[in-house]
Curated annotation (Swiss-Prot):
InterPro entries: BglG_antiterminators (IPR050661), CAT_RNA-bd_dom (IPR004341), CAT_RNA-bd_dom_sf (IPR036650), PRD (IPR011608), PRD_sf (IPR036634), Transcrpt_antitermin_CS (IPR001550)
Originating gene: glcT
Pfam families tied to this protein: CAT_RBD, PRD
SMART domains: CAT_RBD
Listed name of the protein: Protein GlcT
């Protein structure tokens, strides 16, 4: 790993160093204790848990400001959480995650201590779309609760799952939130048009949100599907209510993501909505 020269000690667990003229952040339990500017460090004399090379000055400044306002025990739990996530089977870009997750947990903890809880309307959607990330996030929350002697609500599992998933998917946090929002509004339209309550534990729900997720990705890549004209006519005639509902949902997607919608897309979404209708008729 070479030699690191301390340029700033942020707290007992984090130091900023230079290594071959590259500024890096070293993280490890007690790594910053009694460390002064100009001291030389190496992996023979200290235990380095993580090394981060933050690319931009903005990233560096933001991370430094976060570390400076965090208690040592909170930061250590965050470090442990990042290590836990990095060691899972998911291909997480920990360099990107370190800033977003540190930021999120520090302020989520502060809000919790002040009894200011932010609700997450997309918990169910996140659980279904990003089940692996959600499972890991739940374990992270369990660890945070135990280490900090607090009780983060389930909403936080959803938020952290999105942070994890956004570092494994080809979508940003903003895009993933938009997709969750579209799915939620789509379910609202279905419930209104079919006069029902959608069971979010059902196979129909899981298939629907997966279809919408991949539909949006496909449309953004300009990958279109095609259905035969006679098949289109048959579905429109057989399931007029479901077709109308699908049209509403896809019109919303078209406006939200600025994509082109074909008749074939409406037809295939109609079939997914019809599964909800079938379930109603069977009950």
């Amino acid at each position: 790993m070479g030699e690191y020269i301390v340029t700033k000690t942020l707290n007992n667990n984090v130091v900023v160093c230079t290594n071959n003229d590259q500024e890096v952040i070293l993280i490890g339990k007690g790594i910053g204790f009694n460390k002064k500017e100009g001291m030389a460090l190496n992996d023979q004399t200290i235990t380095i848990e993580k090394i981060y090379k933050l690319e931009s000055e903005q990233q560096k400044a933001h991370y430094k400001s976060l570390v400076e306002i965090a208690d040592d025990n909170v930061l250590q739990v965050i470090i442990d959480s990042l290590n836990f996530i990095s060691n899972t089977a998911m291909n997480v870009d920990s360099k990107q995650l370190v800033i977003s997750l540190t930021d999120h947990i520090i302020f989520a903890y502060k809000r919790l201590k002040q009894n200011q809880v932010i609700s997450n309307p997309f918990v169910m959607e996140t659980m279904q779309l990003y089940s692996d990330a959600y499972h890991i996030a739940k374990q992270v929350i369990d660890q945070l609760n135990a280490a900090l002697d607090v009780h983060f609500p389930e909403d936080e599992i959803g938020f952290i799952a999105l942070h994890i998933a956004s570092n494994t998917e080809d979508l940003s946090m903003h895009e993933m939130t938009l997709i969750n929002n579209v799915i939620k509004k789509g379910i609202d339209i279905i419930e209104s048009d079919l006069v029902t309550t959608v069971d979010k534990e059902s196979l129909q729900y899981q298939r629907f949100i997966r279809h919408v997720q991949f539909l949006i990705r496909r449309l953004r890549r300009k990958e279109y599907i095609h259905a035969q004209d006679d098949f289109v006519s048959m579905i429109k005639n057989h399931y007029p209510i479901c077709y109308n509902t699908a049209y509403k949902i896809l019109t919303m997607i078209q406006k939200q993501f600025d994509v082109n919608i074909s008749e074939s897309e409406i037809i295939y979404l109609t079939l997914h909505i019809h599964h909800f209708e079938e379930r109603i008729n069977q009950s």
